[in-house]
Amino acid sequence: MSDHPGPGAVTPELFGVGGDWLAVTAGESGASVFRAADATRYAKCVPAADAAGLEAERDRIAWLSGQGVPGPRVLDWYAGDAGACLVTRAVPGVPADRVGADDLRTAWGAVADAVRRLHEVPVASCPFRRGLDSVVDAARDVVARGAVHPEFLPVEQRLVPPAELLARLTGELARRRDQEAADTVVCHGDLCLPNIVLHPETLEVSGFIDLGRLGAADRHADLALLLANARETWVDEERARFADAAFAERYGIAPDPERLRFYLHLDPLTWG
């Protein structure tokens, strides 16, 4: 290993995975991510308690790679008493949050095209569900454990008790369920700029990464995260609104602002 993860981290070496690996991140969930020295592979390792979640991510990557949507491919899978390790082919390029506003504006049409292709995958063929009720159940669990990350919340909500934030949203569930039933697509589940990889020269989309939350859901669950996250790159609100309009035109559907708001406020309550 050319770099070292934190103490107690599960590493590729524990599973006999060959090669020289560099530690990239260690997530709060206990997951550790490593990049091969030649940048062709990634390894994600978790302790045994989190192996089922990583196995679910493996299955989603394997399924999506057969749907004509660019992304990683599963190369190896290891599981044992120490935990589990998923090795995938790297998606070449640079995450879209690491390019400036000018480059993101150039890439924006390609991003809209790629998201549309993902959402056009026949939803009946998708074996994974990320329905609204299951997402709300996850939020209830996170809130009950007091595990909501305040920094994930909009600034204006950070002093509001998470239970109150969730109660505001659950009052809308009947309407949102009906909308989901009428507009379910294959969603990425965490469609923010770091999970969209761009070719550094052409600025075309090389692929989607971090697919652990992929599943059938209301398309607005994806669009809310993407459009809000892109606002961190656009230099002002006028350009952000122009980008939103350009995305809608290229994507082919004008998003519903109220559904965008709902999913944008629900998502931060599901991480913890």
Curated annotation (Swiss-Prot):
**Active site as annotated:** 190 (proton acceptor)
Instruction: Report the EC number(s), separated by commas if there are several.
Output: 2.7.1.87
Gene3D superfamilies per the UniProt record, alphabetical: 3.90.1200.10, Phosphorylase Kinase, domain 1 (3.30.200.20)
The record's Gene Ontology biological-process terms are: response to antibiotic
Note the superkingdom of the native organism. Answer: Bacteria
User: What is the enzyme's main class?
Assistant: transferase
Keywords recorded for this protein, A-Z: Antibiotic resistance, ATP-binding, Kinase, Nucleotide-binding, Transferase
Among Pfam families, the record links this protein to: APH
Q: Can you name one GO molecular function term for this protein? A: ATP binding
Q: Which reaction does it catalyse?
A: streptomycin + ATP = streptomycin 3''-phosphate + ADP + H(+)
Q: Which PANTHER family match?
A: 3'-PHOSPHOTRANSFERASE, PUTATIVE-RELATED (PTHR21310:SF41), AMINOGLYCOSIDE PHOSPHOTRANSFERASE-RELATED-RELATED (PTHR21310)
Q: Which family does it belong to?
A: Belongs to the aminoglycoside phosphotransferase family.
Described by its record, this protein's role is as follows:
The aminoglycoside phosphotransferases achieve inactivation of their antibiotic substrates by phosphorylation.
- What is the official name of this protein in its record? Streptomycin 3''-kinase
